[in-house]
């Protein structure tokens, strides 16, 4: 008999520069979390990541954070510039809250699909 292959479940966490890991929700109930310079807004099509608006938020906004999807998971998120990212199982994406100047680069380990309002100068490093 063939084994049933189940799709990945929505699971991911943010790994902060300090090494702290914060689980991202998958409830779709529009909760908001404020973490180290960013606001995470749960939407039905993924978590929207926005820079916070306080001065302290802006001070850490240039730091890069990891979004990590463990093995067997999948996750959809929307970067601060509106780019949609579908991260597959066992993948990591590193991104800044603010892209500085014309450099719009993210770093990917694993597999992801990018879409939405991507501009031509968007770059994925591996």
Describe the residue ranges of each PLM region.
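Short acidic/polar, Gly/Pro-enriched loop/turn segments located at secondary-structure boundaries
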Residues: 1-126
């Amino acid at each position: 008999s063939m084994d049933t292959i189940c799709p990945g479940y929505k699971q991911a966490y943010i790994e902060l520069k300090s090494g702290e890991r914060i689980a991202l929700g998958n409830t779709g109930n529009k909760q908001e979390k404020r973490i180290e310079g960013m606001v995470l807004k749960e939407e039905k099509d993924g978590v929207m990541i926005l820079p916070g608006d306080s001065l302290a938020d802006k001070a850490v906004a240039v730091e890069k954070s990891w979004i990590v999807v463990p093995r067997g998971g999948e996750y959809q998120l929307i970067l601060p510039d509106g780019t949609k990212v579908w991260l597959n199982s066992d993948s990591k994406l590193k991104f800044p809250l603010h892209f500085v100047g014309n450099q719009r680069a993210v770093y990917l380990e694993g597999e992801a699909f990018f879409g939405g309002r991507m501009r031509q100068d968007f770059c994925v490093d591996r």
